[in-house]
Design a protein with these regions (language model features):
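Pre-Walker A adenine-sensing motif
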Residues: 1-9
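Post-Walker A helix-loop "phosphate-sensing" segment adjacent to the P-loop in P-loop NTPases
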Residues: 35-50
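Conserved RecA-like P-loop NTPase ATPase core
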Residues: 9, 64, 129, 193, ...
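Conserved inter-motif catalytic segment of the P-loop NTP-binding fold
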Residues: 21, 47-143, 147, 154, ...
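C-terminal regions of RecA-like/P-loop NTPase motor modules
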Residues: 119-120, 158, 202-321
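Phosphate-binding/switch region of NTP-binding enzymes
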Residues: 16-17, 22, 26-27, 125, ...
Length: 321
């Protein structure tokens, strides 16, 4: 399997990045697109801290299809990103903005015409901003979205490209329930995609969190990014970029592994003390899941288990010579 960015965006695939308005989702994906066009690592570590997750990319032509922001703002953002990354002027980036008549992804003829355009550029990443504006006026809560998603899958298969669709989450999505339920629209939308990433943002902050809510391939652990920008003397956007920062990850398998290792740094622990220490650090993770992951780490020789007094299981970190 080939990925455009390490562990992200299989070729071919259909993917959705979604979130509430104002979560910087379009800007974040534009940042990814520019990095792929230039073959640069996406989300380099923030200069002011350590940690975070970066994604090396494979250089490929890319295409952005905008029916949301409008031409002026779209070009302004891409220019600011290109200045930050010192992207060559001949970088393989194709941008369509507010074409009229608009693309109708429910119309196979429109998709066939798009296939021809993609063929001339060789684009391996095609971004649509956004799903609602390319669906030909179809109610996104209706089963008619099945046809839209089928056509986008056909586009991916014929071109061999990764398709990224920018979409919105449901209003008033509260605590509880399955994470994927936040994805707005008919159930066929989520059913048709290979990867869904939800983007959230704390009010007034330039920090965003990205969490996988569906994956048919590799598990994507939660990651976080910081948005940076500056303006010129005229007040226009001069440069912009995202950096990786340490994620606020309290539920993934990686988080469980992290807390197990942290707990064992101070010495050996019996099973009850170990799982309780992890549970204290990760209150939303169940006891059974923690115990299962402890056993998996023992099986992979990532931690040691010996039998102590009264047949108690004692766990320690391996000692490497």
């Amino acid at each position: 399997t080939q990925y455009l960015a390490a562990g992200l965006l299989e070729l071919p695939s259909v993917n959705i990045f979604y979130g509430a308005p104002g979560t910087l989702k379009s800007f974040l994906i534009a940042d990814l697109l520019v990095c792929i066009a230039a073959g640069k690592t996406w989300l380099e570590p923030a200069p002011w801290q350590t940690g975070g997750q970066s994604f090396p990319t494979i250089k490929n032509p890319v295409m952005w299809i905008d029916f949301d922001m409008g031409r002026r703002r779209t070009i302004e953002r891409f220019a600011a990103l290109a200045r930050h990354y010192k992207t060559p002027t001949d970088a393989p980036i194709t941008i369509y903005s507010m074409s009229n008549p608009p693309l109708d992804a429910s119309n196979p003829g429109h998709i066939a015409e798009l296939v021809a355009r993609v063929a001339t550029t060789g684009a391996k990443l095609i971004v649509f901003d956004n799903l609602g504006t390319i669906s030909g006026g179809i109610d996104e809560n209706s089963s008619a979205m099945i046809g839209v998603m089928f056509n986008l899958r056909w586009l991916a298969d014929v071109t061999g490209a990764a398709i990224v669709i920018i979409h919105h989450q449901r209003k008033g999505n509260g605590i509880g329930g399955r994470a994927g339920d936040a994805l707005r629209g008919h159930s066929s939308i989520e059913a048709a995609i290979d990867l869904a990433l939800q983007i959230t943002r704390e009010p007034y902050a330039e920090l965003i969190n990205i969490e996988m809510t569906k994956s048919r391939g590799l598990e994507v652990y939660p990651f976080s990014a910081a948005f940076t920008f500056d303006h010129n003397n005229a007040g226009d956007l001069e440069t912009a970029a995202f950096y990786s920062i340490e994620p606020d990850d309290k539920q993934s398998n990686r988080a469980i592994e992290r807390e197990i290792k942290t707990a064992l740094q101070s010495g050996g622990m019996i099973q009850t003390a170990l799982w309780q220490a992890v549970k204290d650090a990760l209150p939303d993770v169940t006891k059974n899941r923690i115990l299962d992951y402890i056993k998996r780490m023992v099986a992979r020789n990532e931690i040691n288990m010996t039998v102590g007094a009264k047949n108690a299981r004692v766990y320690t970190m391996p000692v490497f010579q």
